[in-house]
Amino acid sequence: MYDESIILARGKSMNKAVKWLVVVGCAVMLCGCGNSENRKEQQQSLRTQGIAQAQSGDYDSAVQSFDQALKLSDMQVGSLELDIAAYKAAAEYHQGNLDQAIDTCSAILDVKKSAEIYLTRGLLYRDAENQEAANADFTEALNRTSKKDLIMKGRLYYYMKDYTNAKSCLEEAVKNGDQEGVYWQAELYWDSGNQDYAVSLYQNYLSGESPSHQDAYERVASYQISQEKYDDALATLEQGIAMGDQGSLRSLLSSEIAVYERKSDFPTAKAKMESYLESYPDDADAAREYEFLKSR
């Protein structure tokens, strides 16, 4: 299942979240073709294609790919369709179409109630600074979440700023051996302003088996940079970059360049920027910074 951090891509208010965002296409799109194994394979292929397009910043093409995948659903909305729809909403969010992303979520909820989609729409409402609507959706998601799903419950309480219940759920999850809970504990303490403790939790999480939240490296590195521990920050960034594009690669690469500049290692910063611009040629701010680096 998707992670809403993708959606938010860490724009911060929605950043997680919205990593990259996801949502189901409009109900009108859920029409047409049979649900054969072949069509499922086509849906999976289009989903993979759309994710790759979104990761490269081509959100228009990503939305088209997700739409094509949803058109193969034959009026059936299962976990795959919900996942694809969520990715569509995320792409719409990154296009700057916040209202359209919300509409995409609403269309799916008209067809099938889903805790994940209520969560996604709630994050979108929060980004639109409609906290009342966001909390209503978080509450709906909470009501549809199993009592055993301590991580989901903890996240929902966290988004609702009910930190007492959030801490309780996440602590219990961690006691049960769920490393994912450590990441969300770190998020909670970071947003609460206790960055020292949050960073220790992020590092605990990253030292575990197969950490999946790439943005945790970004958090730790930003803290190390603020402490002027540049070599430590570079080591952290390199570990995050080694994951490939999991939603935070662009930010990690940008931070890496900034650290080399702070170290006054302008030749390396320039070389890193050249590589960065090959991947993200439309980044106007980076292009201007490159002109500065060429003069050093």
Language-model-derived ranges and their functions:
Residues 48, 80-83, 87, 120, ...:
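Canonical tetratricopeptide repeat
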Residues 29-32:
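C-terminal motif of bacterial Sec signal peptides marking the signal peptidase cleavage site
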Residues 55, 90, 94, 127-128, ...:
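Register position in tetratricopeptide repeats
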Residues 42-72, 83, 87-94, 123, ...:
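Alpha-helical segment of the N-proximal tetratricopeptide repeat
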Residues 80, 113, 145-146, 177-178, ...:
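Short helix-capping/linker turns of helical repeat alpha-solenoids
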